[in-house]
Amino acid sequence: MNRALISITVLLLVIATFPAASIGSSDNNPPSQPIPLNYFGMHIHLTVTANGMDPLRPWPSVPIPELRLWDAGVAWPNIEPRKGAWNFSELDVYLNLAEEHKTNVLLTIGLSPGWASARPAEPSISRPGLAAEPRDLEDWRTYVATVATHCKGRVEGYEIWNEPNLKAYWSGDVDKLILLTREASEIIRRVDPQAIIVSPSATGSYGTKWLAEFLSKGGGQYVDVIGYHFYVNPEPPEAMVPIIQDVRQIMNDHGAGGKPLWNTELGWSKPKPFPSDELAGAYLARAYILNWVTGVERLYWYAWDNHGWISIETTEADNRTLKPAGKAYGILQQWLVGSRIVGCSADADHTWTCELNRRGTPRWIVWNVDRTEPFVPPVSWHARRVTPLLEEGRNTTTNIFISPIPELFE
């Protein structure tokens, strides 16, 4: 996870300087295909125990098409706590639940257990040694091969390490992680040729330098997808736009422009305050919209059942009752899946307009970043109905007020 603060100054300067800042121009085209259901990813990491599903933490009541397993008790130290002593009990519960709910799984591999770590006493994210590379490359090969064999046909893809630009997660150099990526890729492709290989996912605006070095040294040739964590906490989702554009430019500069870009982890953390749960839900919705239109083809939200570190919670403390963010996750699937986003633009007043097209029928999503104000939809839209994100729709387009909470016009 990333707790750093990232400034939105550049984005606001662009919007303030020009009458309209647009996304979807020739150099930043949204994906041309309709938005698929599997664009919507999620983290679930408190739902299961080694003995099965925790009855106090039920599976989400909204569709979860894609699941990233991280902070879920299934990293290398959990799977092989001692050399040769394998424990797949908790991972198997996740895989069984995923199969039951027709959910694809992305498994993030890595973190060196103490017995395998090159620097077992070195401080890391939770206990010493985790961030170091393995002392013996053969231990890494055995771990990857064993996991890939165990999970063959049950895991859609493997992500090689988490947030390597943060010393708490990775203390080795880029060359060492390229080596681990190469070895893991070769093994996984041999064991499970259908599996998707995702690059190590750097995080934040300061992670672009790490990604550029990884790609410039040839790391991209070993992966199918470029992963990144576009955290902008505590700033609003619009702050992601220039960072995503920077990452896409880096990919183009280093021969990886043709690979998909996935945002494999995103959320907002405490102490970021939200004046209302409705605004928190709006952040989730705007993040999914803007990631897609800037070229991200999958986004994994962090996290469904975390009530401690995150500030945008999807459920109440009972882990059943949906909060506005949980509702927004499901509603947004209904709004977006099957639609093509033509583009988004922001005017000088920070009002964003995104044009959608579903099977030839145009629709528009509108919000203002920082205030509530009257809005008159253009006559050319021929809009007859407006649906606020968290409310019932109504057959009128008069007396409309837009706010930071998106509204759908159709």
Language-model features: locations:
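Substrate-binding cleft and catalytic face of glycoside hydrolase catalytic domains
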Residues: 62-223, 229-233
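C-terminal beta-strand-rich structural cap/linker in extracellular carbohydrate-active enzymes
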Residues: 393-410
